[in-house]
């Protein structure tokens, strides 16, 4: 029996990148490792891709671009970086939506702090 695709998503779990991020100037002086989860809804569902890499979102390329973007410049807020990653995915890859969660390991009394954002592509 043939199925009807309802949802196709590409998930990148716990991508570790180094960046300079934090509100205090001293915190941005040294690079720190953050973790990023990314959820991408490609423009085509998996059934339409016919095992063709050119018809999907290349997750290795996404990881490379996220790492480059994170290292591009210092930022105060992980919120800013999360939105920039969503925007980059939607503008550079064939995706209809992107969700990004960034975890930062800065407060000793917590495992991590995190932010999450989700964006949808506007018509191209």
Predicted regions and their residues:
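N-terminal, polar/charged subdomain of small-to-medium soluble alpha/beta proteins
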Residues: 1-124
